[in-house]
Amino acid sequence: MDKISIRCFIFLVLTSFVTTVSCLSAATDYREVEDEHEFSYEWNQENGPAKWGKLRPEWKMCGKGEMQSPIDLMNKRVRLVTHLKKLTRHYKPCNATLKNRGHDMMLKFGEEGSGSITVNGTEYKLLQLHWHSPSEHTMNGRRFALELHMVHENINGSLAVVTVLYKIGRPDSFLGLLENKLSAITDQNEAEKYVDVIDPRDIKIGSRKFYRYIGSLTTPPCTQNVIWTVVKKVNTHRYFLLFFT
């Protein structure tokens, strides 16, 4: 191999390495931040929502993104889908652990996997689910007591979130299963509690109508092109205010 060929070979190897590292970095940067100390939901704070886009370079979409979430579900970006044929669930029981992330409560699943959904022909694996109180999305200006996000990811790293809204009313059987575990970590930021085997199919999706739009993560880095599917029917529960406020 002559000197020119060697130089070309080295250049190609280095280029391939840099490209691979860049792709790996991109694949890890889109995930939502779990450390609540890096940002705040208080608008009057230096690290509040209005400043998220300036806190870190990789969070710039929080300030400049044009497809940000949450939004009001009456927004023109949203369409009402009247059947669930485009959303097929293939969930299965899986070991799970609850974590108090400060800004929300998260249920993360074990490495064995908790199944997936199919959205428009593409499979998205369920990574975790978490709750926000009060709700982040609104419906005709109305904010609800609780909002569940079921976060999914496809093979290319794209995200899809299935959302269920809750109001005060009859107890919800799925939340009821978690009440004791939730209460144990309510006042302990970053605390974790093993839950045992959880079946995501137990989460009630009692409607064949849902809202669909393309948005973003609702926490930094505010990654866009997230497929949001918000169940139209609002669920109920009577105890969650104790655990999520």
Swiss-Prot record:
Binding-site list for substrate: 218-219
Residues given in the record as Zn(2+) binding sites: 130, 132, 149
Classification via InterPro entries: Alpha_CA_prokaryot-like (IPR041891), CA_dom (IPR001148), CA_dom_sf (IPR036398), Carbonic_anhydrase_a-class (IPR023561), Carbonic_anhydrase_a-class_CS (IPR018338)
Induction field: Accumulates in low CO(2) conditions.
SMART domains xrefs: Carb_anhydrase (SM01057)
Summary of the tissues where the protein is detected: Expressed in stems and roots.
Cofactor requirement: Zn(2+)
EC number assigned by the record: 4.2.1.1
Active-site residues, record numbering mapped to chain: 103 (proton acceptor)
Residue positions the entry lists as glycosylated: 95, 120, 156
Single biological process term from Gene Ontology: response to carbon dioxide
Subcellular localization(s) per the UniProt record: Plastid, Chloroplast stroma
Catalysed transformations (reactions): hydrogencarbonate + H(+) = CO2 + H2O
Gene Ontology MF terms: carbonate dehydratase activity; hydro-lyase activity; zinc ion binding
Family: Belongs to the alpha-class carbonic anhydrase family.
Protein name: Alpha carbonic anhydrase 2
Organism for this UniProt entry: Arabidopsis thaliana
